[in-house]
């Protein structure tokens, strides 16, 4: 893989998304993307191998055409389903004065993988919380420091069920590409949070097609994560049943007229739907539709609150960040703001061509890949000038409502809803995005990774996969 190209694959329940990006000084420049809708994935996992493989193959081809990049290697996103999050430490010794480099950091992190004692799981991500040089000097990045005796790391660990890992990788590599590494959504979500949110304690809610994923960050690090088998498909099912129409029609009206906050929905927007048990068509208003949507989205949020309670997380001072495909619905922010006391925002990636919440996971996978490359010294060159990319952040004024559940001061009693509206985010069918950059010029100006660094990346995950089948 060329040093400046990162390719991520997000295998979601409704679609497979591929992003080709490159690192520049302040972030990621998206070169091209592909998206293919599929029925081969259920609850975030492979349901029909052949259908899923074809969707992955198609979206890789689309991203390759859009970016002008011959895609051979990818970084794969994995869902939170079947994962365990815990803390671990490891230490390596030095017997002479040693300047710490990326190889030493990789060695001390890799040692944690061998300590995994959760049966039938494989460690996929080890993220350093702090390094300790010579047992007393705590640092965030020890590269270029001199160690006389030891390097210790205290890290967070994400392990996933081996069967999930094997099947996901097998399906992707059946498309003729190599998986360089995998990153859990639990870790990826950290890149969509501000430093303040991560420090104070923030909850990410990713409402997808079949699954809603929840991750909580505090003091700058991932604390825990979980998933709920209730999401966008359940909203559509409720609409289909409530309006007595087909699932396909319900999905269409959800995207065109859907509103998750009843008090802000319009009774002037009228649409008609065909009935499943007759040839008649019936008229409904957006407010009629919102009645079904609000009830289900509210239930999803209540399930999220239950997850936080089960994890013992009673403070969400950094706020709630909602993303994923169902975050496109109007009124989601208003509804959650009406249920909690802390701030709420909808996260949408800022990069041109992927400004939809459903691309959050795919672009975050690239962010994670770059972060680890820099930590391990794989990436040493910045090819771009300093270009500031400012992300839109939606704030909600702090509210002093009483807590509805004792001890959970982010949860508040239902109050009179305000009649406010959100700007609708357009949702289109399968698209291939291409940036306005001159890709030919990029190819001429950039270099390939040196062979030794490429070997490091390739062998790292190959060794992991071999160990799974031993």
Curated annotation (Swiss-Prot):
Disulfide connectivity for this sequence is none
Q: Where is this region: Disordered?
A: 416-470
User: Locations of Basic and acidic residues compositional bias?
Assistant: 436-461
Subcellular localization, per the record?
Cell membrane
Q: Which GO terms describe its biological process?
A: cell division; FtsZ-dependent cytokinesis
Annotated signal sequence is none
Please state what the protein is called. Answer: Cell division protein FtsA
Q: Which organism is it from?
A: Staphylococcus aureus (strain NCTC 8325 / PS 47)
Chain's gene name? ftsA
């Amino acid at each position: 893989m060329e040093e400046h190209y990162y390719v991520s694959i997000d295998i979601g329940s409704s679609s497979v998304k591929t992003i080709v990006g490159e690192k520049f000084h302040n972030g990621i420049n998206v070169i091209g993307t592909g998206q293919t809708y599929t029925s081969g994935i259920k609850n975030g996992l492979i349901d029909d191998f052949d259908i899923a493989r074809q969707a992955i193959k198609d979206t890789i081809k689309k991203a390759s055409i859009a970016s002008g990049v011959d895609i051979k290697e990818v970084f794969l996103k994995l869902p939170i389903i079947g994962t365990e999050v815990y803390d671990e430490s490891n230490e390596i010794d030095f017997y002479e004065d040693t300047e710490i480099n990326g190889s030493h950091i990789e060695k001390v992190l890799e040692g944690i993988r061998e300590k995994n004692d959760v049966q039938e799981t494989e460690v996929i991500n080890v993220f350093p919380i702090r390094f300790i040089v010579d047992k007393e000097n705590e640092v965030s990045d020890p590269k270029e420091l001199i160690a006389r005796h030891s390097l210790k790391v205290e890290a967070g660990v994400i392990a996933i069920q081996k069967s999930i890992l094997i099947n996901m990788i097998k399906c992707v590599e059946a498309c003729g590409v190599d998986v360089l590494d995998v990153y859990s959504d639990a870790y990826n979500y950290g890149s969509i949070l501000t430093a303040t949110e991560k420090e104070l304690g923030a909850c990410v809610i990713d409402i997808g097609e079949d699954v809603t994923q929840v991750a909580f960050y505090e003091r700058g690090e991932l604390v825990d994560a979980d998933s709920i088998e209730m999401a966008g498909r359940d909203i559509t099912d409720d609409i289909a049943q409530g309006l007595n129409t087909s699932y396909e029609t319900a999905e269409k009206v959800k995207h065109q007229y859907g509103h998750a906050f009843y008090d802000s929905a319009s009774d002037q927007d009228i649409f008609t739907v065909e009935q499943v048990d007759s040839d008649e068509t019936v008229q409904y208003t957006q407010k009629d539709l919102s009645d079904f949507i609000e009830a289900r989205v509210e239930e999803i949020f209540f399930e999220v609150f239950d997850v936080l309670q089960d994890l013992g997380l009673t403070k969400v001072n950094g706020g709630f960040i909602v993303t994923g495909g169902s975050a496109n619905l109007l009124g989601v922010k208003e509804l959650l703001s009406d249920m909690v006391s802390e701030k709420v925002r909808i996260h949408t990636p800022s990069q041109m061509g992927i400004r939809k919440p459903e691309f959050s996971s795919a672009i975050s996978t690239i962010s994670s890949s770059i972060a680890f490359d820099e930590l391990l010294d794989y990436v040493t060159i910045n090819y771009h000038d300093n270009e500031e990319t400012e992300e839109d952040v939606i704030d909600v004024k702090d509210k002093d409502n009483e807590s509805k559940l004792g001890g959970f001061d982010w949860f508040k009693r239902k109050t009179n809803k305000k009649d406010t509206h959100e700007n609708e985010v357009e949702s289109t069918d399968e698209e291939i995005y291409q940036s306005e950059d001159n890709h030919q010029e990029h190819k001429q100006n950039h270099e390939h990774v040196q062979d030794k660094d490429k070997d490091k990346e390739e062998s790292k995950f190959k060794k992991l996969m071999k160990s799974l089948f031993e």
